[in-house]
Amino acid sequence: KDDKDIFIARKKYTSQEQFKRDSIILWRDEICKKYLFGDPDRQETHLITETEVEQIPVITREVSFHNKFAVEMRGLWRTDNFVMGGPFVSYTLADPSKGMLYYIEGFTFSPGKDQREIIRELETILYTFRISSELTTPVKN
């Protein structure tokens, strides 16, 4: 069975610097260290961004996310104790009207399987994300 996970985080949007690769990785690792564990009873199993594999670097690129500027990031994650790992895809985008920066990610743990289709499924789910200014108010009858 494939393990597919999604998480969303937000924080105050302060500058374009927050869209830089290293800033996004740092924020991701802070979130993962606090909230995401391979085994919740063991702190050393928190997730981290794998940046030491030269053949598979963490890649960022500027994209349009619902016609808004965003940074897509792709790479590998692993637990701090090297027991688990896999690919992830994420998007970082701002809602300047609310002064918020959002990080949305999908990651999978499915050893021994082709994970391309799993990541594509997670991308599709992530793309349903909307910032509050994009939501429409229902028309009252």
Predicted regions and their residues:
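Signature of long, low-cysteine stretches enriched in small and polar/charged residues
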Residues: 41-98, 113, 127
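Surface-exposed amphipathic alpha-helical segments
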Residues: 1, 102-141
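Secondary-structure transition/turn motif
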Residues: 10-14, 76-78, 107-108
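Short, charged/polar low-complexity linear motifs in solvent-exposed/disordered segments
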Residues: 17, 90, 120-122
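A short, polar/proline- and glycine-enriched secondary-structure boundary/capping micro-motif
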Residues: 17-21, 83-84, 113-118
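Secretory pathway targeting signatures of secreted, lumenal, and periplasmic proteins
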Residues: 2-43, 47-50
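Compositionally biased, intrinsically disordered low-complexity regions enriched in proline and serine
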Residues: 14, 36, 89-92, 103
